[in-house]
Design a protein with these regions (language model features):
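Long hydrophobic alpha-helical segments that form multi-pass transmembrane helix bundles
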Residues: 123-189
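Membrane-interface helix-loop-helix modules in multi-pass inner-membrane proteins
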Residues: 53-125, 138, 144, 223-231
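Hydrophobic alpha-helical transmembrane segments
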Residues: 158-170, 234-237, 301-314
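N-terminal signal-anchor module of multipass membrane proteins
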Residues: 1-56, 62-65
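Short, membrane-exposed interhelical loops at transmembrane-helix boundaries
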Residues: 284-303
């Protein structure tokens, strides 16, 4: 049996996407949490907690997009055509977030509120757009032959908008628990209270999406509820409940600093796993599989050589930067 390059590339793209969600998720979450405080010192601590590492987080988004373009060109073409508007809005949000992140440090006191608002708005827009994209992927795409045949606004449904809200809550929880780990009181205590409210909202959102999805998509319902698959997949929602209860308990314990963030990562991973289980083996639901969308094996093999060289470098840089800038961030500290 030969090596299945399509599966390997799917794993690489999934890994890059998950790394992006984890790394840039709490970064965007901090921008979203600007809505919870107007205190200038608290906002400085929030931004300084990610200032040394945020530049490299979007590398994973570039890797995932480039991998999709090269390894699954049909999937890339359909997704770009079907989701042109939300993807464009996401990029606009990321640009605003990035520019505001840098400019707020250089701005005069009278101009800083503008850049703070741009940071908040860009973070919300980018996050909400990503959630809409996730919802649209779950809904599936109309494809005729090898081209997208749906409408310009097929992505715009109540379900996709709710997914946008859900991802916004998830990123905000990532950001809040990151600040529990990286900040000190009184900001840390405030983020504990905020995290508890966000956790309840996220668990409710997960429950609604978990019920809404199989009701709207019979194929996904069959995947999750038919025997014997039900027995193998049942641990996923059970783990969500267990981790949610564990996280709630630790957020009430002032001695716990890092564990709430780790548990939140677990919730994000389980949600991401649920998405993968629901659509596998389709890369363009409901009808195009990995192998139907794949590039020629020669192209995938050539790209794989480069990926195997660059991914360890990205991982090494990422872990080193987080190691160097570990520890708490205090008022008055900064990296600009």
């Amino acid at each position: 049996m030969g090596i299945d390059l399509s599966v390997i590339w799917f794993v690489i793209i999934v890994f890059a996407t998950l790394m992006y969600i984890v790394m840039d998720g709490f970064d965007l979450g901090i921008g979203i949490l600007f809505a919870t405080t107007r205190d200038a010192q608290d906002r400085d601590v929030m931004v300084n907690s990610v200032a040394p590492v945020w530049d490299g987080n979007e590398t994973w988004l570039v890797l995932g997009g480039a991998g999709l373009f090269g390894a699954f060109p049909l999937a890339y073409a359909v997704i770009i055509d079907a989701l042109a508007i939300p993807l464009t809005l996401m990029l606009i949000g990321l640009i605003f977030r990035g520019v505001a992140f840098e400019f707020r440090f250089q701005a005069t006191p009278s101009h800083r509120p503008f850049w703070d608002s741009a940071f908040l708005g860009g973070s919300v827009l980018a996050t909400f757009s990503q959630g809409v994209v996730v919802g649209a992927v779950i809904n599936g795409f109309s494809v005729s032959g090898r081209a997208y045949s749906g409408g310009v606004f097929d992505w715009l449904t109540p379900f996709t908008l709710f997914c946008g809200l859900g991802l916004t809550i998830a990123y905000a929880l990532l950001g809040a628990t990151w600040l529990v780990m990286k900040s000190e009181n009184p900001l840390q205590d405030k983020m504990r209270h905020t995290s508890r409210a966000l956790l309840l909202a996220l668990l409710a959102t997960i429950a609604i999406i978990s019920l809404w999805t199989p009701l709207a998509q019979p194929a996904i319902a069959a995947r999750w509820f038919n025997l014997p698959d039900l027995f193998f997949l049942l641990p996923v929602p059970l783990l969500v409940a267990v981790i949610g209860a564990w996280l709630w308990r630790d957020l009430r314990n002032p001695a716990r600093h890092a564990l709430p963030f780790i548990l939140t990562l677990g919730l994000v991973f389980l949600g991401f796993s649920g998405l993968g289980i629901s659509i596998w083996p389709h890369i363009i639901p409901p009808g195009i599989t990995l192998w139907q969308a794949a590039a020629p094996p020669q192209s995938q093999g050539f790209m794989l050589v480069g990926a195997l060289l660059i991914i360890p470098v990205i991982l090494g840089y990422t872990f080193w930067s987080y190691y160097v800038f570990r520890g708490k961030v205090q008022h008055g500290e900064g990296y600009h």
